Amino acid sequence: MSEQATSSGLESRSNGLRERNLQASKSAADRDVASQSLEDKLQVEEGEADTEKKTFGRTPDGTVFTVPPTRDMVSQLLSPSEPKNISDIFVLAILGCHILLLWFLPSSFRVAAFAVIFLFWRASYNIGIGWLLHMQSNGRTLVCWAKKSNIFVNPSTGQNPHPTLYKLLKWELETKISEQYSFEEAPTEYNTWLVFRRVVDLILMCDFTSYCLFAIACGGRPTGESFIMLALRWITGMSLVLFNLWVKLDAHRVVKDFAWYWGDFFYLIDQDLTFDGVFEMAPHPMYSVGYAGYYGISLMAASYKILFISILAHAAQFAFLVLVENPHIEKTYNAPPPRKRVADTDTKPQEDENSHEGSVVSDTLSSAPVIPPLQPSSMHSLLGLHNIDLYRSTDQSVLLAQVLFFALTTLTPSTPVYQFCFVLNAALWRIWYSVGIGYILNRQSNCKMWTRHFVKYGESNHEAWRQWKGTYHLSMTMTYASFIAAAWKMYSFPQDWRYGLVLLRHILGASLIALQIWTSTSIYESLGEFGWFFGDFFFDEFPKLTYSGIYRFLNNPERVLGLAGVWGAVLITSTKSVVFLALLSHTLTLAFIQLVERPHMQKLYGQSLRRDAGLVRSLKRSLPPSLKQIHGSVDKILDDSFEFIEEFIEAARPKLAAGVQTFVKDTSALFQKYPARVTISRLEPDLAGYDLKDYSITLEGTQPSRPAQFERASDKEGERARSMPYRRGEQENLMFEYGAPIKVKWTAPLNHSKKDWVGLYMVTDNTSREVTRVSSQGRWIATNQASFDSETCEQGLISSDIVLKSSRDDGEPRDVASGEMVFSGDKLWWTQGVFEFRYHHNGKHNVMAVSRPFEICIGRFDEDDIEVDNYGLVRAAVEAALLPVVQNCFDRDPEIAPQTVEEHYGCLVDRDGKYSKRVVFAVHHMFGIEFAPEVVRADGNIRNLAWRICNAKKVLAPYSMSRSNGASTPTAAHEED
């Protein structure tokens, strides 16, 4: 179910809770109330109390309504005291059919039949409901269906063609909700949600029932199982089922029916929401720990079939979360904050962290102020396969080391000698990763040892940071590569997968490995590149703690979950050597957290450190006082033990310092388009009633810069083609700016179809002028509102069906319908080329009119037309050229597009990579310099980006063939000199 719900006016906090932004205000009316008699005050307070008991909803168009109280699904269906209607009886009848099917089916068919039935209902849940919610989130499709069919309109108005369905829905919904609800007065969004709920009830109940019946069909007792194992299996299974039941009940207590049935896809509510209980224990508890009952039932049934189908269902639920719920939650509740406004820009230009050759770029380039970033730039990240850069020495070293490990692991025999060598190698790398890296960070925290070394040789703290990231990244990858290699050497394939617990061990081991991968990914998403590489050990000017993501539930997730994979390897291999490596890894990790991370965090953040995470707080609230005292005693024992270890290490430090320093010195130098879908459309039989001469499309847009218009007339052509072509007509070629909105004006007969639409295509995509055979890929706008089952197709529609006086070529007067629409943002092509608009008939692909072809182009920056000095380009001209282009790339949205060169980009630029990719594409064609999208996000404003372009131009100037940009090939005149 939807696990997060809020309303307009709710603001997202770092700890993940969403609370209403209440602003207390005093007015004259308040003072009048204060002067009333005591009786009047009591009446006012009672009225306010009654109002506070109500929940108010708000539709996207701003309509406010009272949200009636509703009952939960199980009570509605199974409680005899609840009134039943036709939909309840229908659901109960379907459930009864499932039970009867189990009773009457032969035992040989039960397992296969109920496996298919359960998979059908699971697909209906994750794929069916998922698709409906996805369409509702992006285009409000369900509400559009309801409005288009008029099923909620009173038949007495004559607009509802389904009076019987109207009466049935009215009786159904008012029977279920008897308080504070009126079918006629409720908004369409709320009524649509109520109907959607009934569909969800059917699918969820059948999904759970078919799963339980499938477990009954597969259940049994393994041969030779002892009574102790039987009791342990059932006790554990029942515990998991009861825990699952508590999770669901507590989650419903917190989020109520509104979020349980994804109400925020339809409307929002105005009320205080506090997320506690199970939502403090685990991320997405409804989909994570909320499926523990599946594994409990699998355990009680003692069937691998149940276990495998449970894993499949759980994976499908996570896919539903990632593909449907998370995007909607991000879009609805985590709106980007307002853009930062910079008033004082009298600062020095930022230094590129990846180069320190200051002599290459003239000091005059930094004469204008550049806004520095708040922390080290992460434009060239290290982690992730997509960030691998073979031009970077760190990535080269990592890849070569991995290839070497793979070759040694696969080409050497698994003899005891080799096994010992691999285990020893893994142990040494783990010791270095925890002890060696821990010592470096400890020295860096206390005396900036790492940074001082680079400053001694004239480097900056950014260079020290860059080298540290390479060292840590190489150490981390080598540690895990050596552990995997050792585990592989100790592993042997089982001869019989059905023997004992072999298969179960592999399943649990793989699950633990997947858990560690997910934990590491969540940690990286919460901390970012800066936190992952312990950036606050190197840059302590910005001490700020945020508990978001996985840190909302755990203070140190790497303490347990972060090492789940090594214990998964223990289960899979079942060897003492891997157990030793797992114990060593876990012990050293705990010591690293206690001796390195914790002291630094206390020193840097002090009292702002959180004592207990959400999970610990929940457990403490549920523990009896005696167990709480035991918990405190255990904490004291651990603290005393680590203090003893720390004192021991401090005493031995002088003996180890010289050797470690030598080791550090000796090793310091080591290191756009989706495929088009072909659509075949037949000519509509009613096209004969329309005159194509009544259809037309005209365009208006922003003209490109002067260099773009004259690029085709240059010295590249023959002598006769070096001037602009002579044009006999009055119309000139249509050329528009890259990313600029284009206004489309259309005309059509008065009786044109309300489902007509206009699409944008490349001229070369369609060979036929009568039928469009290529998908528009979302680049289309409907000519009329409420004609399609989506609101996205209406974005950009300005007007429609305005009657114009017109005349045909023969002089005959004729009235036509006209309209206007604007294509912008995602409805444009973000590339250069020749395009056209096509007017289509009746929701099909029959073409009624085609616009004039027009060209989208990016003019190259003309360096010869600007003033230059002895040091190169003037950055002000680059800034002036970039400003309109960047504004177009950011859809001219005032929330993200800068109005001046100093103004910061909106935060949405960091969240959605499409904006920065548009900018680097334009920069590449304007200046001939290719940047990574991360550069745009890291620079943060146009002034920084212009400085970086000038920097790149100056660095690349010696390799330019232009005399103004650098040394060119010597000529005869040079040779004579």
Swiss-Prot record:
<keyword id="KW-0949">S-adenosyl-L-methionine</keyword>
<feature type="topological domain" description="Cytoplasmic">
    <location>
        <begin position="489"/>
        <end position="498"/>
    </location>
</feature>
<dbReference type="GO" id="GO:0097038">
    <property type="term" value="C:perinuclear endoplasmic reticulum"/>
</dbReference>
<dbReference type="GO" id="GO:0006656">
    <property type="term" value="P:phosphatidylcholine biosynthetic process"/>
</dbReference>
<feature type="topological domain" description="Lumenal">
    <location>
        <begin position="248"/>
        <end position="280"/>
    </location>
</feature>
<feature type="transmembrane region" description="Helical">
    <location>
        <begin position="420"/>
        <end position="440"/>
    </location>
</feature>
<dbReference type="GO" id="GO:0004608">
    <property type="term" value="F:phosphatidylethanolamine N-methyltransferase activity"/>
</dbReference>
<feature type="topological domain" description="Lumenal">
    <location>
        <begin position="520"/>
        <end position="562"/>
    </location>
</feature>
<feature type="transmembrane region" description="Helical">
    <location>
        <begin position="227"/>
        <end position="247"/>
    </location>
</feature>
<feature type="region of interest" description="Disordered">
    <location>
        <begin position="703"/>
        <end position="724"/>
    </location>
</feature>
<feature type="topological domain" description="Cytoplasmic">
    <location>
        <begin position="220"/>
        <end position="226"/>
    </location>
</feature>
<feature type="topological domain" description="Cytoplasmic">
    <location>
        <begin position="584"/>
        <end position="977"/>
    </location>
</feature>
<feature type="topological domain" description="Cytoplasmic">
    <location>
        <begin position="302"/>
        <end position="303"/>
    </location>
</feature>
<keyword id="KW-0256">Endoplasmic reticulum</keyword>
<feature type="transmembrane region" description="Helical">
    <location>
        <begin position="304"/>
        <end position="324"/>
    </location>
</feature>
<feature type="compositionally biased region" description="Basic and acidic residues">
    <location>
        <begin position="28"/>
        <end position="55"/>
    </location>
</feature>
<protein>
    <recommendedName>
        <fullName>Phosphatidylethanolamine N-methyltransferase</fullName>
        <ecNumber>2.1.1.17</ecNumber>
    </recommendedName>
</protein>
<feature type="topological domain" description="Lumenal">
    <location>
        <begin position="1"/>
        <end position="88"/>
    </location>
</feature>
<feature type="compositionally biased region" description="Basic and acidic residues">
    <location>
        <begin position="341"/>
        <end position="356"/>
    </location>
</feature>
<feature type="region of interest" description="Disordered">
    <location>
        <begin position="334"/>
        <end position="366"/>
    </location>
</feature>
<comment type="similarity">
    <text>Belongs to the class VI-like SAM-binding methyltransferase superfamily. CHO2 family.</text>
</comment>
<keyword id="KW-1208">Phospholipid metabolism</keyword>
<dbReference type="InterPro" id="IPR007318">
    <property type="entry name" value="Phopholipid_MeTrfase"/>
</dbReference>
<keyword id="KW-1133">Transmembrane helix</keyword>
<feature type="topological domain" description="Lumenal">
    <location>
        <begin position="134"/>
        <end position="198"/>
    </location>
</feature>
<dbReference type="InterPro" id="IPR016219">
    <property type="entry name" value="Phosphatid-EA_MeTrfase_fun"/>
</dbReference>
<feature type="transmembrane region" description="Helical">
    <location>
        <begin position="89"/>
        <end position="109"/>
    </location>
</feature>
<feature type="transmembrane region" description="Helical">
    <location>
        <begin position="563"/>
        <end position="583"/>
    </location>
</feature>
<dbReference type="GO" id="GO:0032541">
    <property type="term" value="C:cortical endoplasmic reticulum"/>
</dbReference>
<feature type="topological domain" description="Cytoplasmic">
    <location>
        <position position="419"/>
    </location>
</feature>
<feature type="compositionally biased region" description="Polar residues">
    <location>
        <begin position="1"/>
        <end position="15"/>
    </location>
</feature>
<keyword id="KW-0443">Lipid metabolism</keyword>
<feature type="transmembrane region" description="Helical">
    <location>
        <begin position="199"/>
        <end position="219"/>
    </location>
</feature>
<keyword id="KW-0808">Transferase</keyword>
<dbReference type="GO" id="GO:0005789">
    <property type="term" value="C:endoplasmic reticulum membrane"/>
</dbReference>
<keyword id="KW-0812">Transmembrane</keyword>
<keyword id="KW-0489">Methyltransferase</keyword>
<feature type="region of interest" description="Disordered">
    <location>
        <begin position="1"/>
        <end position="62"/>
    </location>
</feature>
<keyword id="KW-0444">Lipid biosynthesis</keyword>
<feature type="transmembrane region" description="Helical">
    <location>
        <begin position="398"/>
        <end position="418"/>
    </location>
</feature>
<comment type="pathway">
    <text>Phospholipid metabolism; phosphatidylcholine biosynthesis.</text>
</comment>
<feature type="compositionally biased region" description="Basic and acidic residues">
    <location>
        <begin position="712"/>
        <end position="724"/>
    </location>
</feature>
